[in-house]
């Protein structure tokens, strides 16, 4: 759309023809839709810049409710059409679990968020942009990105802006004789008591792969990677990079999963985000660290009160604990996610502590609790989280719980500052455990009234229905442990 003022214009897609006369937008659908379209002048400038850098193709990605990116690759020549809402449309309900819609329903239209645009580091002839889905002239209510943006607006109405940092952990794997094995594994003894974390030789051995990741994150993407951690199992790594706003971190999370897979392919490897790849290994998590800024007091971290955590930080903790099981259903959304919430790894010379959370409580630097208050920064860490999640949905519910805790002045129980692996049976009765399996988590999610406030009915029906089905399908198999 070059201008909304002047002679009669016409925007046409598969289902709608809408007239625009003298700056008046005729019809509710196009009023909302056009308001969301990027500025045409900016679009032209970006297209010119991309072409000058050798970009020939565009991936406009929307995210399904499970957290998978979807796209139709298109030539750069169609970039302006994409940004004007005249690009590819999607029958989202044909490729995603949306039983409310059928083959006769209208398609969804992606509107790109140009602030998320980047050039793909693994193929610099391609650019990537995240898009929001629109349907029948309104934000599509099963679009996770739209859902998070809606909650961000609610948070802002309470004078709160969230910043998030994540600690993604994963295994680097390869195929050997038709079986998946660890690609970086120098230890001939698969089971031993000693943990492998921070191992120097192990870190050095992985550098051929890791150097490329480090350079991309810092030089190409400017994500401010601080370090790479050799985690507690061979072949397992953690990336620690800078925090950003909540929507930006959700975008980074999705892009990182794709990036790691693409770079691994170049080395003959593949990446496993499975939380618990084998019983003898540590769990792979993706801890969520968040802080909150007061919008009216710019740059003020409301979790900091001198050299201690503030009263509002405690309100936030209370909100997270109140809705902890429901948040965990989103942050740990697979059957396998719950295999790691155990105090120790058996078989390692009598067992070895995993440092995985087991209870819905909090403590000062307590890594055995769901919520940790770190000793070196004023943020709140949710440790019951992994890389299989849809971050847009997790951040939506987590921030809603925190906002509720702060605005309602909720108070948490007493902190637990001892290892939860060593508590007595009597002490354990006073502290709720994390959900023990996916079914418990989804039951809690379904019963939590806050989920109905922040998610559309269609989103809830889709997620809950799919996860119940996933639990049922899991029980059609027999595991090696049972045999």
What are these regions, as identified by a protein language model?
Residues 65-70, 138, 172, 233, ...:
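Flexible loop/turn segments at secondary-structure boundaries
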Residues 26-225, 244, 249-252, 269, ...:
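ATP/Mg2+-dependent ligation/transfer catalytic cores
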Residues 27-33, 42-45, 85, 262-263, ...:
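Catalytic-core signal marking the mid-to-C-terminal active-site face
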């Amino acid at each position: 759309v070059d201008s909304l003022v002047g002679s009669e214009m016409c925007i046409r897609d598969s289902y709608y023809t809408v007239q625009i006369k003298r700056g008046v937008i005729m019809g509710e659908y196009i009023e909302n839709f056009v308001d969301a379209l990027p500025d045409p002048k900016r679009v032209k400038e970006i297209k010119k810049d991309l072409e000058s850098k050798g970009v020939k193709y565009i991936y406009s990605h929307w995210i399904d409710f499970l957290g998978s990116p979807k796209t139709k690759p298109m030539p750069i020549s169609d970039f302006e059409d994409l940004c004007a809402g005249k690009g590819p449309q999607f029958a989202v309900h044909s490729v995603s679990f949306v039983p409310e819609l059928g083959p006769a329903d209208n398609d969804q239209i992606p509107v790109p968020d140009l602030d998320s645009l980047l050039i793909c580091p693994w193929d610099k002839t391609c650019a990537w942009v995240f898009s929001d889905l629109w349907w029948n002239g309104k934000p599509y209510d099963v679009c996770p990105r739209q859902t998070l943006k809606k909650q961000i607006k609610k948070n802002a109405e309470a004078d709160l802006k969230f910043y998030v940092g994540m600690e993604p952990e994963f295994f680097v794997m390869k195929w050997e004789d038709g079986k998946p094995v660890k690609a970086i594994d120098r230890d001939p003894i698969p089971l031993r008591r000693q943990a492998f974390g921070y191992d120097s030789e192990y870190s050095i051995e992985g550098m051929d792969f890791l150097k490329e990741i480090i350079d991309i994150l810092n030089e190409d993407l400017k994500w401010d990677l601080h370090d790479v951690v050799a985690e507690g199992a061979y072949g397992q790594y953690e990336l620690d990079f800078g925090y950003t706003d909540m929507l930006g971190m959700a975008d980074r999370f999705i892009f990182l999963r794709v990036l790691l897979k693409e770079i691994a392919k170049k080395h003959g490897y593949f990446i496993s985000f499975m939380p618990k790849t084998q019983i003898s290994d540590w769990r792979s998590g993706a801890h969520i660290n968040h802080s909150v800024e007061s919008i009216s007091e710019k740059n003020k971290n409301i979790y900091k009160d001198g050299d201690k955590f503030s009263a509002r930080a405690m309100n936030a903790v209370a909100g997270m604990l109140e809705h902890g099981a429901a948040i965990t259903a989103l942050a740990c959304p697979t059957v396998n996610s719950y295999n790691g919430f155990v105090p120790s790894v058996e078989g390692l010379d009598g067992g070895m502590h995993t440092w995985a959370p087991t209870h819905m409580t909090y403590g000062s630097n307590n890594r055995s609790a769901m919520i940790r208050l770190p000793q070196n920064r004023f943020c709140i860490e949710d440790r019951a989280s992994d890389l299989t999640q849809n971050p847009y949905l997790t951040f939506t519910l987590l921030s809603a719980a925190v906002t509720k805790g702060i605005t309602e002045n909720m108070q948490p129980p007493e902190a637990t500052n001892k290892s939860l692996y060593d508590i007595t049976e009597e002490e354990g009765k006073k502290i709720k455990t994390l959900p023990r399996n996916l079914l418990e988590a989804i039951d809690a999610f379904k019963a939590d009234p806050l989920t109905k406030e922040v998610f559309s009915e269609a989103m809830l029906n889709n997620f809950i229905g799919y996860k119940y089905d996933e639990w049922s399908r899991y029980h059609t198999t027999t595991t090696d442990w049972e045999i």
